[in-house]
């Protein structure tokens, strides 16, 4: 039990750090999992990875509660309207990934969940971040806040999110890159990426958990403890990381993350080539 909890803490930290940074949580977990296996049961390991995502989602909801909850006192009609408008944009933004994900998710997991695909995605999107940031360097953002996003804008960002079905792409990376490439400010692109994560990650996590319970029955007591520990650690770390990222991008661009992705991608290739990861 002790070592199971320790592994859950380590993986929760990795998930909390990488989920909302554009560096691919999958790319990191595929490496860490080789050294810190939460379980010999592959189905439980996969389910654990989706459960700890719930902790990261809770961090977003808690941080942005006032901007996401339209009910209760103290809000003007304009504020309520903006909140409902934000939710409409989120729903429109997730439509492409819901459709494509439903059609291709199982095929992607079967054929693309390997270190080579992950490493290529890390490198390709790392280069894309550097290119887009250089291209947009001297351009003023066309959209500075989520309130100014049009439905056409969010649909385009939603199609970028579809790219994250490929392992190693990074859901946050794809949506932030998509936002910046169409002229959205870094802050607005990052925040909308956080908001899109709520229905996207919640839906996938619930489906994966339901699938596990249907196939394997209820979790054991030890498994429940491990899941809760991992989810709580992911929540705490993600909360801190989101606040840090929002401060960071006020004075920095995303090129550093692009270079980091390239280095990580090369590392994954090296580890895969010598057989350390499979």
Curated annotation (Swiss-Prot):
Topological category with respect to the lipid bilayer: Multi-pass membrane protein
EC number(s) given by UniProt: 3.6.1.27
Name of a matching Pfam family: BacA
Keywords of this entry: Antibiotic resistance, Cell membrane, Cell shape, Cell wall biogenesis/degradation, Hydrolase, Membrane, Peptidoglycan synthesis, Transmembrane, Transmembrane helix
GO cellular component terms listed in the entry, alphabetical order: plasma membrane
Record flagged with keyword Flavoprotein: no
Major subcellular site: membrane
Catalytic activity as recorded in UniProt: di-trans,octa-cis-undecaprenyl diphosphate + H2O = di-trans,octa-cis-undecaprenyl phosphate + phosphate + H(+)
Subcellular location: Cell membrane
Primary role: Catalyzes the dephosphorylation of undecaprenyl diphosphate (UPP). Confers resistance to bacitracin.
Other known facts: Bacitracin is thought to be involved in the inhibition of peptidoglycan synthesis by sequestering undecaprenyl diphosphate, thereby reducing the pool of lipid carrier available.
Family (UniProt): Belongs to the UppP family.
Protein name, entry field: Undecaprenyl-diphosphatase 1
Native source organism of the sequence: Oenococcus oeni (strain ATCC BAA-331 / PSU-1)
């Amino acid at each position: 039990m002790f070592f199971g909890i320790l592994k859950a803490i380590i993986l929760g930290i990795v998930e909390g750090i990488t989920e909302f940074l554009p560096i691919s949580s999958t790319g990191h977990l595929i490496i860490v999992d080789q050294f810190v296996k939460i379980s010999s049961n592959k189905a439980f390991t996969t389910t654990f990875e989706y459960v700890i995502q719930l902790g990261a989602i809770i961090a977003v909801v808690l941080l942005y509660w006032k901007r996401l909850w339209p009910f209760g006192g103290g809000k003007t009609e304009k504020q309520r309207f903006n909140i409902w408008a934000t939710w409409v944009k989120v729903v429109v933004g997730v439509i492409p990934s819901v459709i494509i994900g439903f059609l291709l998710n199982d095929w992607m997991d079967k054929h693309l969940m390997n270190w080579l695909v992950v490493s290529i995605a890390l490198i390709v999107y790392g280069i894309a971040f550097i290119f887009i940031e250089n291209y947009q360097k001297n351009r003023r953002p066309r959209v500075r806040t989520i309130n100014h996003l049009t439905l056409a804008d969010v649909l385009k960002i939603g199609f970028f999110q579809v790219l994250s079905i490929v392992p190693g792409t990074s859901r946050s990376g794809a949506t932030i890159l998509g936002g910046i490439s169409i002229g959205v400010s870094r802050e607005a692109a990052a925040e909308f990426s956080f908001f899109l994560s709520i229905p996207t990650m919640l839906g996938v996590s619930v489906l994966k958990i339901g699938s596990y319970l249907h196939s394997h029955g209820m979790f054991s007591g030890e498994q429940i403890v491990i899941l809760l520990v991992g989810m709580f650690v992911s929540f705490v770390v993600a909360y801190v990381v989101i606040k840090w990222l929002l401060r960071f991008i006020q004075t920095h661009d995303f090129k550093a993350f692009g270079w980091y992705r390239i280095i990580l991608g090369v590392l994954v290739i090296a580890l895969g080539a010598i057989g350390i990861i499979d």
